[in-house]
Amino acid sequence: QETEFKVRYRVDGVLRTERSLPKHMQNMITARIKIMGNLNITENRIPQDGRIKTNINFQQIDIRLSTLPTVYGEKIVMRILDASNVATDISKIGFTEKNEQLFRKMIANPNGIVLITGPTGSGKSSTLYAALSELNVEGVNIITVEDPVEYQMSGINQIQVKEEVGLTFAAGLRSILRQDPDIVMIGEIRDLETAQIATRASLTGHLVLSTLHTNSAVESISRLHDMGIEPFLITSSLIGSMAQRLVRRVCRDCGQTVPATEREKEIFAENGLDVTTIRRGIGCSACNQTGYRGRLAIHEILPIDRTVKDLILARASANTIHDYMKQQGYHSLLQDGLIKVLEGSTTTEEVLRVATTE
């Protein structure tokens, strides 16, 4: 800011101010962080990206740096990547029993594409890493192309995208296919070329895992079509799509059972669920008076069965496919979230914050 220097933390997806420091400390702190990240401390006119590796309590912590010049000096974002917190077990991601079975069935296929969709910060990478951990067994060749490589995994060959030297997702993927892979993970399908190569790879005997930025599982089909992938290729290659969001967990220390409001009862009834009580955190020192501590994922899974393939080939709208999902008993993001409210894991407000009502 113009007269002060703010330090803010994003905890469980919510940004809060930790403290404000005198303006004269800004340049000193900025320079020190840039030195630690091997950045050019004399360059403050352009954005820079760096990395700090450190050990805290005998745990290796990776910190990603991003600097940005603003009118009041450089802004720095430090993203903490703690390898010890990476989910290596699909059962610990927060799936309902039905969704866990659906997801395991999708990634058990020997070939095809499995897509995980959602906005930035929705836990897509963590879910991909959990899937890779379970698939990473003796006799399986797994190669990934990522931007960036967030967590280094033993037994998996990981490629870092470097667009400045021409190593794009598409270029990396073309090279990967000459390396005899069984499973390929693409950090993100961003363009038509990457989508085409991923589709081709899935049709030639490879299991491809990747992510897309769409709001729902159904919209991933529309996105591939909008990129230029023909419907017959989508139906031939796509195994399934899963949308994901993160919601805050009710604090274990201060969570209390309270009666549901009339509005909550209406929302649950509209989604075929009954509710009388929910759990809500009242705030304590453990959760910094927020009532929440930690996060869990809510999901929406669309397996591509014969009927869905016919709908895709007929260029049916996303709403038509969504209606079919409801008829088959598949849960939307909202319904999955409300089920987790009933379990006492989160609150209705959290679910409505990330999942739209229909």
PLM region spans:
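Short, flexible helix-loop junctions that flank or precede catalytic/ligand sites
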Residues: 1-358
